[in-house]
Regions:
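Acyl-donor binding region in acyl/amide transferases
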Residues: 44-118
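C-terminal "cap" of GNAT-fold acetyltransferases
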Residues: 102-161
């Protein structure tokens, strides 16, 4: 679970899918899934979906991974801002966020080459937003960041989200 061929992502975006940010203790008691095509996710005892990694050559789609994660008990996750719309379209609603912290930058992130992305904390609601829906434009990134104050750090943003789950 902690190894990943970063060549399966575009070089520009490989850092965004960082399974190395979790250590062994995060997986104790977790339900771990690895598809035949090498895509992964895990669901912790408290319903946190971690290590979502879609192998580009896998037949299984990203939305199918999330559906399986929810069926396995997943009800929340956090992700870099670049995945914002993907999670909105797949039943997750943003709750809180914090600024990118270079001290916790994932392996492969290069300062100056890639824009630092905020970390967004989502809860599962089951409501799938499409670009055609009015709600989508009300919750879109720009609106979300205007409406929701930035949390001072990762733990604070996580706590805010967890109170809503």
């Amino acid at each position: 679970m902690t190894e990943r061929n970063s060549g399966e992502q575009t070089e520009k975006d490989a850092w965004r899918v960082d399974t190395d940010s979790h250590d062994g203790k995060d997986y104790v008691g977790a339900k771990v899934y690895v598809s035949e095509g090498g895509s992964t996710f895990a669901v912790t005892k408290d319903g946190d979906i971690i290590s979502v990694c879609k192998n580009m050559s896998d037949k299984e789609k990203g939305h199918e991974l999330l559906e399986k994660a929810v069926k396995a008990g997943g009800k929340k996750l956090d992700s870099f801002d670049g995945n914002f719309e993907f999670y909105l379209r797949n039943g997750f609603e943003p709750v809180s966020w914090t600024a990118f912290n270079e001290n916790y930058a994932p392996k492969g992130w290069v300062k100056g080459r890639v824009k630092p992305e905020p970390v967004v904390f989502f809860k599962y609601t089951g409501k799938k937003y499409s670009k055609q829906s009015k709600d989508f434009w009300e919750i879109k990134e720009a609106q979300f960041y205007k409406k929701v104050k930035m949390s001072k750090d990762y733990d604070t943003a996580m706590s805010i989200r967890d109170k809503e789950v």
